[in-house]
Each structure stands twice: as C-alpha cells, then as structure tokens.
C-alpha cells in the first residue's frame, strides 16, 4: 500500500527592512501637542521609522524579501508564488505583489495582495501554509509591508504617535530541519465594527474628491478605547483556540511575538497567558506600529538575537482593522 506523505509547511527564513529616517517623540513634540512622557506612558513607543521619498510598501517589502530569499538558501528563480500583505499599497491596482515581483526580477509567477490590516501577516501566513501543504507550490514568498506615514494626520496626537513604516518577508516551504513549522492558525474578523478603525476615503465608496480631502477622510481614523478592548479579547480567544488545536497547554508556549501596537495590549496578553516578560519580544519602542509588517519584523529580529531551541513553541498574535485578528503557533524543528 502506498502511503502519501503529509506535507507540513514551515518558515524557512525571514527578512526585514526599516527606513533610515527616525521620527522621535521629541520630534513630535515640535509638531503636535504631546510629550515624550505622554506617548511612552500610553503606548510604550519612543521612536518610529519614516520612509523616504521613493520608498513605498512594494520597495520596502522587496528589500526585506531579498534578505529572506538569501537566508533561505534559494535563488529568486526558485520562488513559485508571491503573497503581499499590506493596508497601504502603492496603488489600488496593480497589486503591490506584482510591483515587488518586478523589483525582484522574479519572472511570471502568481503574485497577489492580501489585505487584513495589521493582521495581514498572519492571514498571509495562513494562505502560504495552505498553498504549500496542498502541494500547489514548493516555495512561497510572503511579504508584509506598510507605509502608513502616508495616511497619518500629524495634527492628531492620538494617531500620529503610533505608526511607523517598514517591510518584512519570509519564505514558506515544506518543513525541513531548522525551520519554524507552522503548527496551527486561527483567524477571525467582525465587519460589524469596521468603523472603529478605518481609512475612510480613497476607495470606491468614498472616492477622492476636494470634499474628502478637506474633511480629512484620507487619514487613519481610530476609536482607541474600543479598539483596545476588542484587541485584547479577540487575540486572547484566538490564541487559546490555536494553542488547544495544536494539542498544547498554555504553559507550553516559550515565546510570544505579538503585533506591536501598544505596550499595554502586549502586556495584557502576556499576563493572561502567564508568559514571562523575558519571553515577550517587543520592537515597539524603536519602530512603533508598522501595521502588517510588525509581527514579521519582530520575528526576524527575535531570530537574529536569540537561539530558538529545538522543540520550542512560538505564539504569534495580531489584531487590526476589519476588525480582524489571529494567532499562529510555530514550532522550532530539530536541526
């Protein structure tokens, strides 16, 4: 009898790209009615990176992808599919995936965007996992990048202190020694509360017009207190389900790699799962909220700074507009 091998998808390598320009809290003090103490106390953010002219989501993502492909030991010609998670695409169309493909010089493979706001990396990871495990593709390039500085109102102290720009990427393929196996994924969304976090204008519902520009409809809108409550509750629920479906106890998680939105949210999740502070990886103070790219940027930095031991489990959690949320459990494969 022929027994078909069950394919398991894993992250082979990661990469990240951060713009050079730093926007510090002291810089913001000169722009809006705020202070370093106010920002740090409420968010944990000290500075964030801002893309230069000519640095778009597609470019930042592609630069991160070059690092991930090299670390995976692949050539660009071996990439078979490109997924690009972003909420700040270069254009409505063509896709940022296609633009990144052209920048990278990857020829005529499928390339498409995935939009789930700050949860975009986890959504993209779920799609990449399915494509690899189904046998459709062997090597999938997942990019997550955002340039939210293009949509920030630097006269609104409640939102301008939060966001930064950046790009990230990972290569997903069949599980191999030394890789991070994508053990389980749990995702969710609730469009009935979509208005709590949005960028109202610029789409087909509110096309750009003098009125939408004058009314500030092209800037990020957020009801912070309500978003906070949803974020903690939804990420906790997704994480519990994901951990249980992986056949694990909550105490089995070795590292927490959360979406870098707000230190209070991160600390609340860590507390609920009793994860020691030393095992909660944060980049928030340096980069702020880099939206879809934040989890993968943090994961890439974690892998550069720490040795993940064989058999250790990582929990990724994220929350964003939609409202959308998700959790992913990764396991370090031996070797």
From Swiss-Prot:
Single annotated GO MF: 3-oxoacyl-[acyl-carrier-protein] synthase activity
Swiss-Prot/TrEMBL keywords: Acyltransferase, Cytoplasm, Fatty acid biosynthesis, Fatty acid metabolism, Lipid biosynthesis, Lipid metabolism, Multifunctional enzyme, Transferase
Classification via SUPFAM superfamilies: Thiolase-like
Subcellular location: Cytoplasm
Domain of life: Bacteria
Keyword Cytoplasm included in the entry's annotation: yes
GO cellular component, one term: cytoplasm
Pathway(s) it belongs to: Lipid metabolism; fatty acid biosynthesis
A Pfam family hit: ACP_syn_III
Keyword Zinc on entry: no
Catalysed transformations (reactions): malonyl-[ACP] + acetyl-CoA + H(+) = 3-oxobutanoyl-[ACP] + CO2 + CoA
Catalytic residue list: 118, 259, 289
EC number(s) reported in the record: 2.3.1.180
GO biological process, one term: secondary metabolite biosynthetic process
Quaternary structure note: Homodimer.
Entry's free-text remark on domains: The last Arg residue of the ACP-binding site is essential for the weak association between ACP/AcpP and FabH.
Name this polypeptide is given: Beta-ketoacyl-[acyl-carrier-protein] synthase III
Organism: Chlamydia caviae (strain ATCC VR-813 / DSM 19441 / 03DC25 / GPIC)
Gene name for this UniProt entry: fabH
